[in-house]
């Protein structure tokens, strides 16, 4: 049964052009070619990268964040309340107005007190600034290393500058060691990102990030198995060229170096727009749609490859819109307000609210309505603070 399923899955009539068979992609005469089973090595490597990442964050990024003055915002914990906690965990973090009124009645609280409890409870679950700094530090180091390695591997290759050469003598293109190791490293990294996604900072484009990671993993595995490494390597290098700039911008933002953060964000935006909205459709999509079938008639693998690339392009357009929103805010207000994808810190209470609307914490219990807050202006100042950072792809 397994043999039949494997034969059906790797049917050469599906994945390869006419008159091309898997036998032609076997190693021969000292030449090495990609094999689908090679991609299995990426799984243990991804697990190793997860270990390396948490080691890096714990022993390098965390001390570095303290040395650079990154400090977490002090958050007031929500008062223990079994009824509100049950609703928060079971029915949602943001109750409707009718649910809020019902919960307030059940708990003997005012509507403002109930709203304040949910605000504080949501803020408790939001990642701290140090955690974000550590995540971005790891991604910055890895993206930068991948971009440098990819540039070194591809710089002298003719298809880097002339994408149509990706299809010369296809699929009889021997696998070079440098390209193999870089490709496997990229695949392992994206698998590790998928593994740690539940533990990473969640943003409003979480679903789009999941789609992106899945599509990228499938695209890398698929292109490797079908010896489409040339065009696949161009896609990877194009993406790596902007990602490290984004993470660098975030790092400076967490350090509150506003001018450096804004400058890097503008540079990132220009690189992103040029690589994702200009080069990707005109150089990558054009050659995969039209130039790739110069010597072959369309086949299933051709359509599958282009569907994956179009999905990536749609994600590029989506993220470009978010970046444009950030740039509009920058032009209008003179600095980056916040990431439009961010799960931002909510204000504990506005300056005009009375103390009774959001009771202050004292020894784990709420003060009676009308009582003066114990921390005075500091609580209002902390309440105004929001978590700001730039968007990621």
UniProtKB/Swiss-Prot annotation:
Major subcellular site: endoplasmic reticulum
Taxonomy, superkingdom: Eukaryota
GO-annotated molecular function: DNA binding; sphingosine N-acyltransferase activity
GO BP annotation list: ceramide biosynthetic process
TM segment ranges: 32-52, 140-160, 179-199, 209-229, 260-280, 304-324
Chain residue ranges for the region called Homeobox-like: 67-128
Keyword Lipid metabolism tagged: yes
Motif (Last loop motif): 291-301
Residue intervals on the Cytoplasmic side: 325-393
Catalytic activity of the protein: sphinganine + octadecanoyl-CoA = N-(octadecanoyl)-sphinganine + CoA + H(+); eicosanoyl-CoA + sphinganine = N-eicosanoylsphinganine + CoA + H(+); docosanoyl-CoA + sphinganine = N-docosanoylsphinganine + CoA + H(+); tetracosanoyl-CoA + sphinganine = N-tetracosanoylsphinganine + CoA + H(+)
Record pathway: Lipid metabolism; sphingolipid metabolism
EC number: 2.3.1.-, 2.3.1.24
Modified residues (Phosphoserine): 342, 349-350
Pfam families named among the record's database cross-references: Homeodomain (PF00046), TRAM_LAG1_CLN8 (PF03798)
Keyword set, alphabetical order: Endoplasmic reticulum, Glycoprotein, Lipid biosynthesis, Lipid metabolism, Membrane, Phosphoprotein, Transferase, Transmembrane, Transmembrane helix
Topological domain spans for side Lumenal: 1-31
Post-translational modification: Phosphorylated at the C-terminus by CK2.
Disulfide topology: none
Glycosylation sites: 19
Primary enzyme class: transferase
PROSITE patterns linked: TLC
General function of this protein: Ceramide synthase that catalyzes formation of ceramide from sphinganine and acyl-CoA substrates, with high selectivity toward long and very-long chains (C18:0-C22:0) as acyl donor.
Domain notes: The last loop motif confers selectivity toward stearoyl-CoA (octadecanoyl-CoA; C18:0-CoA) to behenoyl-CoA (docosanoyl-CoA; C22:0-CoA) as acyl donors.
This protein's name: Ceramide synthase 4
Organism: Bos taurus
Originating gene: CERS4
């Amino acid at each position: 049964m397994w043999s039949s399923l494997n034969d059906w899955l790797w049917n050469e009539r599906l994945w390869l052009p006419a008159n091309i068979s898997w036998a032609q992609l076997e190693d021969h005469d000292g030449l090495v070619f990609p094999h689908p089973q090679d991609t299995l090595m990426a799984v243990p490597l991804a697990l190793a990268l997860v270990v390396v990442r948490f080691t890096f964050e714990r022993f390098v990024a965390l001390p570095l964040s303290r040395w650079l003055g990154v400090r977490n915002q002090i958050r007031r914990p929500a008062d223990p309340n079994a009824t509100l906690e049950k609703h928060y965990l079971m029915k949602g973090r943001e109750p409707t107005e009718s649910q809020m009124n019902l919960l307030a009645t059940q708990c003997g609280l005012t509507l403002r007190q109930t709203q304040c409890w949910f605000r504080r409870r949501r803020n408790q679950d939001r990642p701290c600034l140090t955690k974000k700094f550590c995540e971005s530090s790891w991604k910055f180091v890895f993206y930068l290393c991948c971009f440098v390695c990819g540039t070194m591997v591809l710089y002298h290759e003719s298809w880097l500058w002339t994408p149509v050469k990706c299809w010369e003598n296809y699929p009889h293109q021997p696998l070079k060691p440098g390209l193999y190791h870089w490709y496997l490293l990229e695949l392992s990294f994206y698998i590790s990102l998928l593994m740690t996604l539940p533990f990473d900072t969640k943003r409003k484009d979480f679903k789009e990030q999941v789609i992106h990671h899945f599509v990228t993993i499938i695209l890398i595995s698929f292109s490797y198995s079908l010896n489409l490494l040339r065009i696949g390597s161009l896609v990877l290098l194009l993406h790596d060229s902007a990602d490290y700039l984004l993470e660098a911008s975030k790092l400076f933002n967490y350090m509150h170096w506003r001018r450096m953060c804004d400058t890097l964000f503008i540079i990132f935006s220009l690189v992103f727009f040029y690589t994702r909205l200009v080069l990707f459709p005109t150089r990558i999509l054009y050659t995969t749609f039209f130039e790739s079938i110069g010597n072959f008639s369309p086949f299933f693998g051709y359509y599958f490859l282009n569907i994956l690339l179009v999905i990536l392009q749609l994600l590029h357009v989506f993220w470009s819109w978010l970046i444009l929103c950030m740039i509009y805010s920058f032009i209008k207000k003179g600095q980056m307000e916040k990431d439009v994808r961010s799960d931002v810190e909510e204000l504990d209470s506005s300056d005009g609210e009375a103390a009774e609307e959001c009771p202050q914490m004292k020894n784990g219990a709420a003060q009676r309505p009308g009582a003066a807050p114990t921390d005075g202006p500091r609580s209002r100042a902390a309440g105004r603070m929001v978590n700001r950072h730039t968007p990621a792809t």
